[in-house]
Amino acid sequence: MAVFIGGTGTDVGKTFFSSLILGKYGESLGLKYFKPVQTGDDSDRITLMRLTGLHESYVLKNYYSLAFAGSPHYSSELEGTEIDTDELSRHLYSIRDEKIIIEGAGGLLVPLNRRMLTLEVIRQAEIPLILVAPTSLGAINQTLLSIEAIQNRNIDLKGIYFLGIPDKTTEDNIRTITEWSGVISLGSFFLNSNERISCECFQEECIPKFDLDESIKNILV
């Protein structure tokens, strides 16, 4: 089945998390990667292919590619167009039973046009969601707000995956978020810095450490 990878905000690590999934299970489970809406350059697809070493056949083309790196609703307006969220919802619904990792653009409440938020499209498409959350100061508020928005729309939230550079608040942040929300943690992955990770490091060090208890795999199969 398809799974939507959403985040509490921009740059929380959705592409890195998607790369971990595809790098570990792409070939064995026959997974594909799909980012329906891309703003700015095509760096997310390129990053995933660079890190995982997967052929471009594993990476589907964006449904919308917008030049300006901004919120999708605004980026599309600058190009004199509008994202057709009805069409996008129907397309996502049609692929919901396929083995596709679908990455969202920005946070969950990002508008795709002046009438529709990302979460509404996920709800209409009836696709389950994994929430990628940060681990540092501020994570509690961001994550609990995102979870509340998800639950208010009766979206199937499979769990939270924590990703980031740890600090003194990290351990308690994870505990507090799971206790207050009642949503399970699917795991965590800690980085040493924001520096660019080489494909060798990713494949030799990151992938072997990922999903040791197969919580993510069990969702995908």
Curated annotation (Swiss-Prot):
The active site is at 35. It is found in: Cytoplasm. One of its GO terms (biological process) is biotin biosynthetic process. Its EC number is 6.3.3.3. One of its GO terms (molecular function) is ATP binding. GO terms for cellular component: cytosol. ATP binds at residues 11-16, 44, 103-106. Its cofactor is Mg(2+). It comes from the Bacteria. It catalyses: (7R,8S)-7,8-diammoniononanoate + CO2 + ATP = (4R,5S)-dethiobiotin + ADP + phosphate + 3 H(+). Mg(2+) binds at residues 15, 44, 103. Keywords: ATP-binding, Biotin biosynthesis, Cytoplasm, Ligase, Magnesium, Metal-binding, Nucleotide-binding. It is an enzyme of class 6 (ligase). Pathway: Cofactor biosynthesis; biotin biosynthesis; biotin from 7,8-diaminononanoate: step 1/2. InterPro entries: DTB_synth_BioD, P-loop_NTPase. Gene3D superfamilies: P-loop containing nucleotide triphosphate hydrolases. Catalyzes a mechanistically unusual reaction, the ATP-dependent insertion of CO2 between the N7 and N8 nitrogen atoms of 7,8-diaminopelargonic acid (DAPA, also called 7,8-diammoniononanoate) to form a ureido ring. Homodimer. Belongs to the dethiobiotin synthetase family. HAMAP family: BioD. This is ATP-dependent dethiobiotin synthetase BioD. The lineage of its organism: Bacteria, Pseudomonadati, Spirochaetota, Spirochaetia, Leptospirales. The gene is bioD.
